[in-house]
């Protein structure tokens, strides 16, 4: 009976430790993805100031794809809304780049940045 209790306690401890490790790995993955998003955003800004539409397009499409990844397990309606705004603005940014519309691309970039700031404000509240 005592051996059974020890095995049970060890199993529970192992499950707990594995769940903590999973959370740390998820956080690390999330941080890596956010760094990629920031790098793509910086590249877009560089493309805007140099009117390099291929650079804007490439990075806007990469951001749009990356933005479709699931970031939270329990997505609130507010979070989903922020994600949709992000997808929309990265999409309009890519379209403006295809059309070589610097003013449209600049506006979309500004809207995208606003969406990023709002989403991070929301995440800090969760």
PLM region descriptions:
Residues 1-12:
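Bacterial N-terminal signal peptides that target proteins for export
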Residues 14-22:
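C-terminal segment of classical bacterial N-terminal signal peptides
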Residues 22-113:
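Extracytoplasmic c-type cytochrome modules immediately beyond a signal peptide or single-pass transmembrane anchor
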Residues 112-124:
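The canonical Cys-X-X-Cys-His
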């Amino acid at each position: 009976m005592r051996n059974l209790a020890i095995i049970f306690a060890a199993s529970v401890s192992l499950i707990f430790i594995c769940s903590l490790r999973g959370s740390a790995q998820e956080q690390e993955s999330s941080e890596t993805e956010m760094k990629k998003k920031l790098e793509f955003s910086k590249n877009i800004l560089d493309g805007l100031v140099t009117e390099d539409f291929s650079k804007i397009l490439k990075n806007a499409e990469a951001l749009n794809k990356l933005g479709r990844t699931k970031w939270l397990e329990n997505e609130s309606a507010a979070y989903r809304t922020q994600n949709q705004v992000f997808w929309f603005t990265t999409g309009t940014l890519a379209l403006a780049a295809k059309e070589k519309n610097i003013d449209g691309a600049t506006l979309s970039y500004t809207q995208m940045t606003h969406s990023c700031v709002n989403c991070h404000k929301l995440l800090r509240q969760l």
